[in-house]
């Protein structure tokens, strides 16, 4: 019987009409492009630590992880940049250690009424003061304003005109909470009331980083394409980079084939970020460099970066992320921002870059931390996030096509004379399918040079295993327009004695 049926048996003799459906030629792959935010939760949250959970709103994030928690703040930044795509949270309990603490000292009392535009972790906290307020009253007003906003990542208490601000969560990450005032300055209508002076000691003393053994284990085989992992200590990064690595047990290994990429952020001066880049070398990880002067915590920068990357790469994994805005993130003031030469150096050092050219920071180059091959020589194979993002799309397309069209097929040599309709393939048939898939990918702007691909594509039966097909798949990934260089060789007038050979 030439036609290969899957359900209707060959010995069926009952009349009359029997039909089975075969979707192998109809379907196309659909991928959710799931994001995962990893962060510390508070004890007041209802979520189970180390267990991933889908989140659909900021209200859910607050309830699950605790208002003012690190992870709740990350969701706030994510939703400000991407409210359309699927996102999960992976809460971890506070590490053993201490919470960061800082102070706001009311040095002199106001002589006129006004509003203090206080900023805590980049969040505006307006505090009204009267002309007759003493330093103690002002300090108490600051505490009341802070305690009234549950979304803030700190608590506050005042003694003798000094407000002590303490992070709600323990860990080294709590050191990144910034306290300032009048961020937008007089041009933005923000200045301290006349006579009032405040002195800040930024939060410090936060210690400890979470352990991720259980959290990573509980992810199981769930596919997550865009992971926001804001912890940049070497132990945390190694744990996640191992999970998403190329090894046999990694998500990019041939056994699991889950793929996925990691996004993070790190604050520091230029030399510190360059030094940090020297310690990392992972194709799957992209760390965004942030200036010291930004009042927004790095864990929210990381969430914003992840959100914009997820939204853009899901639409087109080969398109560059440059100029995508990182909404809700407050950049450092202009005199604290990286120079263009420093940004260029960071890009070469394996640090993703952002720049503020108007009022909102935008992604400049989505570099990964991969800069060297196994011998320690410089290598740009995995320099950009778009490379693995594009390969993810190509390999999933290919896997969907092969597993849908040839799920239970026989394998024969090229030239075998088998009947039409048989569930049988040859190397030439498989090669034709791969070429057809490549043409679709080329039409969709993921690859180029289809003729060269067909020439270099190899599909053959394994000489030692007659049931196995080996494929050398050589895609030419489409590139991005990242540099437009112009030599403006001007004239004051053509045919001025220098260009006499130019025709009129």
Regions found by a protein language model. Name each.
Residues 97-110:
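Disulfide-bonded cysteine-rich modules in secreted/extracellular proteins
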Residues 57-65, 108-178, 227:
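Extended, beta-strand-rich, solvent-exposed assembly scaffolds of outer structural proteins
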Residues 36-38, 79-83, 144, 219-416, ...:
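A glycine- and small-residue-enriched flexible loop/hinge signal that marks low-structured segments
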Residues 136-143, 212-216, 237, 241, ...:
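Extracytoplasmic/secreted envelope proteins and their assembly/folding machinery
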Residues 119, 173-189, 242, 487-490:
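Extended Gly/Ser/Thr-rich low-complexity repeat segments
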Residues 110-112, 116-119, 184-210, 219:
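Bacterial flagellar/type III secretion structural subunits and associated motility module proteins
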Residues 106-108, 131-133, 158, 206-214, ...:
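Surface-exposed ligand/attachment interfaces on beta-rich extracellular proteins
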Residues 1-88, 323-328, 342-504:
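Structured, hydrophobic secondary-structure cores that serve as assembly/anchoring elements
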